[in-house]
């Protein structure tokens, strides 16, 4: 028993000694950690002081110079940083120095490279340092240039304000005002504020009392001041998040949290009621009907485009968006008639600037969309309907900065539609496009389900892009510093796309190769496409900028190529359906065969661009309307023609007969020809009918050279089935007979009656 008591007392004594020993050991470890940390920080401070006092960029590691500026050569002009990312290699080098001299076991976790920092810290540094390097930075395409080895762009050694520049000043000017810099900034904006786990924009421009707690930012600034000591890291404090938004997107009007409602589109309802400024309709996603009206409260923790995205999602899920001007009113009436006939239930938003569409025409379009008296012409289709359309008009005049309102004319008006509509997901249609497929089905395509986009192919026309334009486009793509530090990468590997066989490439890779290597334009046909705006706002912004920039505005025809180029530049996934477009109608046999080699050929000449399903069995949609010609005065002008046109004109006994053929008779839906994209099998109709807008597609069979019976077929001749043709013909008949003269404005009594009827139905 005595022995047991001694054992217990010894154990207690041992425990009483162990606890102080453990506590003491812990204190020693903490002290050593502080000493080591202090040693490392002191070492780097000493190194920084020495570099400031004794070293210049001439002493920098060539590898760092290459990563930052693209060259190991130290040039006073070319090594002036114009992007915050050009500073990062110097910071990373200092981290390497700390790691190599550190005694810490977890030194890699303690001393982090820039790309290992939190997204918040990287974004803070990037956007604050923009102001450190140059608080006059801009994303205005009116001031930016493409930095290629070309004299075009900088006017005889003058800057955007007309001030003369010497050679070195011009070089620096080109670097500072390079379009690439704007694209890099917007991609960083996308990464920081628009994707998963976004950064709070208010943390970029915080109140001063929060600044002292930013340990990581302090380290970044101290380290970089060693190499670049003449910059003011506090420059950004002069600005706030709203001034930042305007510098990022100059075409958007100025606003604050309190004034945001003033720039919300002015909205006209399907019954002609103009909503109070700032108020928006909220649609039921299932019924497509308006549940209530609400005023969106701007969230200052988010950016402008994040707020616009969230606001759009609260208004409506899916819908149709249109670009429309007064001169397109007759086509708009036909468009609405075809949607009524096909039973569309998706809401429609017409996005326009106030002066583009008069109130009289708005009232008439509302009549065409809602009146029970606006009926489709009689036809033989058993499943016809006449569903009133939910058409809303969004005047975005106040959303656009006054200095930019005149920059969105013609094809460029489409950018306002795709950016400023109030839908989470949308299908855009040209006003002369006709979809034979239910609009909602475009959201169900394989391409859309995979990427949140579906675009369609153009005709395979043999028309090249200017080599200078290709060089400009190439400068816009993400580079290594972005890829490393913000994970903004080019989703298509250029080497793979250019070197692999065409049949092994995806549609997107094939288009990349055709455009950038073979310089072939006409890749995308933008008459109908679908985009999930909740995922893909920024690619549309970049696409608009490419089209608005003076040196790429006319590189391709209209807006179409800019869509996929915007997605490519943004590093976002996108999808084009793989089938090239074709021509629809009756075919004629060609008689001008190429000697004995071309044994057979047929062609279809039409004013429509026809788009088939992936299996090439179903006609999805056409661009160009449902009759021979969509242009109002073309028949009168063509009737006056002689020469080559006389043979075409001789088909008709009178002008009235030709006019009916042009504007009333629906196009034939018997056949579609999809020409061989590798052959030159598209040509403009020689007669020049419909103002030269008729194109011919050829399907041919050739005898192989020096062969007796080996034949090759080029292109495809598709016969549409009878059931499909009945539907297509009925839609085209309704489209062709819908007449603007059958529209008018509702009376107040009619509007009340329609609204009451609508409430009863809901």
Curated annotation (Swiss-Prot):
Keyword Transmembrane: yes
UniProt xrefs under InterPro entries: Alpha_mannosyltransferase, Nucleotide-diphossugar_trans
GO cellular component terms attached to this protein's record: Golgi apparatus; Golgi membrane
Transmembrane segments: 17-33
Membrane disposition: Single-pass type II membrane protein
Residue intervals annotated with topology Lumenal: 34-762
GO molecular function per UniProt: alpha-1,3-mannosyltransferase activity
Main location: Golgi
Gene Ontology biological process terms, A to Z: N-glycan processing; protein O-linked glycosylation
Protein localization: Golgi apparatus membrane
The EC number(s) this enzyme carries: 2.4.1.-
Function, as annotated: Responsible for addition of the terminal mannose residues to the outer chain of core N-linked polysaccharides and to O-linked mannotriose. Implicated in late Golgi modifications.
Note from the entry: Present with 1780 molecules/cell in log phase SD medium.
Family: Belongs to the MNN1/MNT family.
Protein name: Alpha-1,3-mannosyltransferase MNN1
Taxonomic source organism: Saccharomyces cerevisiae (strain ATCC 204508 / S288c)
Gene name tied to this protein: MNN1
